[in-house]
Amino acid sequence: MSQTKNIIIFGGTGVIGKYITSAILASKESFDRVALFTSASTVSNKKEQLEEWKHQGLDIIVGDLTKDDDVLSAYRSFDTVVSAVGRNVIAEQINLIRLAEATPNITRFFPSEYGTDIEYNPQTSPHEKPHQLKLKVRKYIREEVRRLDVTYLVTGPYADLYLGNSNNAEYGSFDTKAKKATLLGSGEDPVSFTTMKDVGKLLVAALKHPEESKNKALKVNSFTATPNEILAEFEKQTGGQKWDVEYTSLAKLTELEKKAWEEGNPAATVYTLRRIWTEGGTLYKKRDNALIDAEETDSLAQAIAQVVDSQA
């Protein structure tokens, strides 16, 4: 299949989107054109960031992703669509995919996944509430897409967020100033993580390896660690003193999750995802980094060093 040369990004200024956009621009010599499709309000609200990217060679296309004419007009000059839209507009991708399938020059599409594997467990995954919109997107692709090559980049949780000082310690937290942590599960339950910087790096690697990533759900990561291993590294990097530690057991986490959904708590999704991770829903016998020549990734020590610095 032909190499990716012209990329259009949707959702490229969001939580993970900004890392993806930055990584693609850092490898711009590998591509002919990189553009960001965004709204007029984003152009106004994120002017400084967009100006910086424009100096790095990013083209800005202003439009409304809910308007077919805007999207079709934008698609005209590109061969690859990278979607990084947020959870609140995941379902809007179905229309982006439908229009891409109908646009002959578009040959590749990366839906917004970059997180927990929504098809990890055939028995339980279909029923997890946070997965529903992404599952609808995958269902549409399986049933309706015939021409496009589709690649899902499944990264597991973002290390940067999991390792942070949460405003709700019950679902896990690491506070470097107070030297206090709340660990999930037994402390010995391994979780596969990807730093947000590596999400961008791995996405670029997939873009550069079209044959290897063609029509695959790539299971990639930066590192795997248990909460106790994470704690030990935090203690090492903060002077060697033992931290105060509490635990939220898997049973307690499940109980808190149930209560959060019943009360309409916005944090319910976080409880569900962290329960899935603690149960082992990020673990594989083999990761796919080697398929796309992306074995060099951030380590646990590097990820924690960033957190320690950010909390200083």
UniProtKB/Swiss-Prot annotation:
Gene3D superfamilies: NAD(P)-binding Rossmann-like Domain, UDP-galactose 4-epimerase, domain 1
GO BP annotations listed: terpenoid biosynthetic process
Transmembrane segments: 7-26
Alphabetical keyword list: Glycoprotein, Membrane, NADP, Oxidoreductase, Transmembrane, Transmembrane helix
Active site, UniProt feature: K134
Highest taxon of the lineage: Eukaryota
Molecular-function GO term, any one: oxidoreductase activity
EC category name: oxidoreductase
Any one of the GO CC terms: membrane
Xref: InterPro entries: NAD(P)-bd_dom_sf (IPR036291), NmrA-like (IPR008030), NmrA/Isoflavone_reductase-like (IPR051609), PCBER-like (IPR045312)
Membrane disposition: Single-pass membrane protein
Compartments, record wording: Membrane
Main location: membrane
The protein's annotated pathway: Secondary metabolite biosynthesis; terpenoid biosynthesis
Enzyme Commission identifier(s): 1.-.-.-
Protein purpose: Reductase; part of the gene cluster that mediates the biosynthesis of enfumafungin, a glycosylated fernene-type triterpenoid with potent antifungal activity, mediated by its interaction with beta-1,3-glucan synthase and the fungal cell wall. The pathway begins with the terpene cyclase-glycosyl transferase fusion protein that most likely uses 2,3-oxidosqualene as substrate and catalyzes glycosylation immediately after cyclization. The fernene glycoside then could be processed by the desaturase efuI which catalyzes isomerization of a double bond established by efuA to form the core structure.
Family note: Belongs to the NmrA-type oxidoreductase family.
Protein name: Reductase efuL
Species, as recorded: Hormonema carpetanum
